[in-house]
């Protein structure tokens, strides 16, 4: 790893001098730096990942109502104020490009994520979301099976009387993988244990690779893949998963007149409009990429954050259990879309958890494609990457009263339940994005998180392994990303209602 960092420094120096003239546009924007002005800017780029959260907070505090610039390893990031959001949310993708921004943010040159069209968005918006009432039973059936597989029978027996140590992140990742696989590739693949274990490991290695790449920079990481364990592993895992999905695509095309599957892969096959979108390889890559990144891992992180928020608050857990019993009079397997909507207290806790512990500092990442002049005369130039400092805005006391305090029922106090729901995108709930390109899968994610948490509340008591440990397990911060701890052990025990 030391050699990799030396190479990173050399590459960053070369990139800095080659690209310095190309970064003149927007030079009137104030730059938030860690190092004094007499030091070269490449030092700020090298140290961005170690102090990004502090830099964002400083920039937001000093320039709340005007843009400021951050110096990242791969490019400059122009952080724009919330006042521009309403103007920009209506702009089209040929003016503000969300796909390339997501591609860059996910180290697309290394991981192959994400993709070069909006096919996955169309599949989610036109097929998945309208079908949610009918999809929920399949998700619940798979989660019921998944809980039996993820918590082995021997552990299940011990759980009846004893506390059993479980890694909550790994548990939730496996549950999410199994449930999402049912909806994305269907049976029999979703019950293939090798596929499931490989998919979960693939998700972990993708994020480990992104973590490494943000330290080394996007310029040299693609050339050092053979030296990075997570890169080698996820390429091998992706090849296996892709071949399995390719076989399923071939089977479906050969039996196209039979009963068609009703899953994400099939929807993409039917909605593909170009030759490039229709190729089996592109369909497989899109399905695997969205399954791993947009659904499984983000749902797993949000659910783990939520478990950690509840772990030191027995009163909150009991309050949520009471709601579950009131809403689910037919038991956990009786969950429907309506009962999901009736879980208003859980929904409030989910939204508050995401407000305090989001997946990252920013939302609304875009690459500027055309010159844009905003209403106050501020100009955006082609090639600039922009974002909104969502975490800072949503924890700003001037925007939200008592913003630094975690108040689980904060959103129950609001008048309009629809506008304060977990999956509702708004200026006060920025982490799903804004406008026409807000996260299309947020409704599915909401239901999956609720279903998993509901089962945990119904069936288990849980606490930190170390009884002396107090409070919430700390987050892991890397650059502008926020992760729940993946190493914390939580003790679970089966509940026995009196």
From Swiss-Prot:
Underlying gene: idtP
Iron in keyword set: yes
The name this protein goes by in its record: Cytochrome P450 monooxygenase idtP
Pfam families (UniProt xref): p450
Gene3D superfamilies: Cytochrome P450 (1.10.630.10)
Free-text function comment from the UniProt entry: Cytochrome P450 monooxygenase; part of the gene cluster that mediates the biosynthesis of paspalitrems, indole-diterpene (IDT) mycotoxins that are potent tremorgens in mammals. The geranylgeranyl diphosphate (GGPP) synthase idtG is proposed to catalyze the first step in IDT biosynthesis via catalysis of a series of iterative condensations of isopentenyl diphosphate (IPP) with dimethylallyl diphosphate (DMAPP), geranyl diphosphate (GPP), and farnesyl diphosphate (FPP), to form GGPP.
Cofactor: heme
InterPro entries: Cyt_P450, Cyt_P450_E_grp-IV, Cyt_P450_sf
EC number: 1.-.-.-
Free-text disruption phenotype from the record: Abolishes the production of all paspalitrems, but accumulates paspaline.
Single GO biological process annotation from the record: secondary metabolic process
